């Protein structure tokens, strides 16, 4: 039997400006950019197009690479079947899927997932994450599971995974209360361990139920806990091929957002992909900490009604994140700023940011510029190249001794799209003059020249 996951994956995205982006089966694609540029809409478009070709806004089409693995084997493993004539009916998370002898051939012949959309694609928008925490009706152990909580309620693998990952963020376990009655709520509290002696099993279960009744229930907690839990409830279902997660940081404090990024990166297998829209540096850092080689960043900007897309591919992301100094810098914050200035050191950043802020305030404006220290001039070209690839407005301020190293300066020049031969002659003249015997400076002439430069800069 093949180990290839049934279903398929999105192998290419076509954007409305004509840009095409190749996607790997295990890619984690992160959409970033200013507000109202199309990040969330991109996820909505992908979900709609995964079903069938239809009019969309930002993403105009997708290409899906199908797996030849038998769909019936997957359905048999996750849901009981009900025979209806020549077809078998499977109920999975409230969605009905019919299978007959022609299903696999028909599935492979169609370009999209069609009726199997919700078997292979999990769409985790904010509303879905909050409402999925509501307790589902109780079912028998062998009944079709139409809610993720049913999986945690009747399979210890899911229950333990859910509780362990919830505890990473909030320091406490959660458990499904299958003895609650008509519904199965998720309860927050230490794992119940009964050490007493009981006359019979019924008495032990009654004591277990009474302890869970004292615990707080997830659906009654704040939106942060509910949103976090909602993502976990879908992530634990490993038969999905593609996850769409809109702003997973919603309602979360930065530490929990970072943990969520780590959990997503740890959980997704190499046969699963994920598309995320986010405003959170912490989500991105969490993902990068565990799986930098899988990350692809797509920055979306918009001018009037036209979208523009810039891509930072996996190898470039991994290269930057592999540098220890850059890993612990604020470089990822640049994805959410209007402009960026690169400096050599943190003290340079502080000095220039004070100057820039003062100038902006004198005109009644606020600074939208991020100053990033590169840990020295040798890293400047690498960072500038990466940020420019994402269409970020980048400026660079280096110390004058950058001119002492021909290769470093050449790398910086080329990182800004300037051909080295066009500046090499002037560079050589300046360097030759810098290294020539020093002449005495006339202070009055220097003062006059400096004042003239300042006056002309207004």
Which residue ranges define each predicted feature?
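N-terminal-biased segments
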Residues: 109-118, 161-194, 330-349, 360
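Acidic, divalent-metal-binding catalytic cores of TOPRIM
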Residues: 285, 300-458
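Switch/communication elements of ASCE P-loop NTPase nucleotide-binding domains
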Residues: 1-52, 197-333, 350
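Conserved, well-structured beta-alpha core segment at the onset of a catalytic domain
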Residues: 2-69, 132-151, 357-398, 402-403, ...
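Charged, glycine/proline-rich intrinsically disordered loops and linkers
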Residues: 69-90, 195-216, 220, 423-457
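Conserved P-loop NTP-binding catalytic core
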Residues: 2, 45-135, 139-140
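Hydrophobic, Leu/Ile/Phe/Ala-enriched alpha-helical segments that form helix-helix packing faces
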Residues: 46, 50, 162-174, 264, ...
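Extended helical coiled-coil dimerization/tether regions that scaffold
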Residues: 2-6, 12, 122-228, 233-242, ...
